[in-house]
């Protein structure tokens, strides 16, 4: 929805940032399509990526860790005191993102709690991480709460939700 300039979310972001917004997917980033130090400096750059984008189990997933001449111009702007990902080329997309210290929004963050997911997130060197989840962990720093009726009114709940109260944990699933 963020790449659709007619979508209300995108229109709001465009309004808030004076139309200086670019939304990128993984392929656009790898190709350096309108993604360079000047554009990143002059606009809000939103990178829409999934955890799968950084999984290195297949050829496509490894591309974010490989040398990439399309992104070589970013290396001139790296902070020599910055945090670098060991054994990853300085022109690799993941290294470029790491050097930007991005603000990261993790949707459905309760699905991203494995050691590998946390390590991958740390490799991106975020300045801030905002976790979005319907099931926060105990002692989470909850910024806002939206009840299910409000979500239903906003058509945010796509499937019927049926909740049963069980008298004891041993009765779950029965």
PLM regions and their residue ranges:
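RecA-like P-loop NTPase motor core of helicase/translocase proteins
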Residues: 1-174
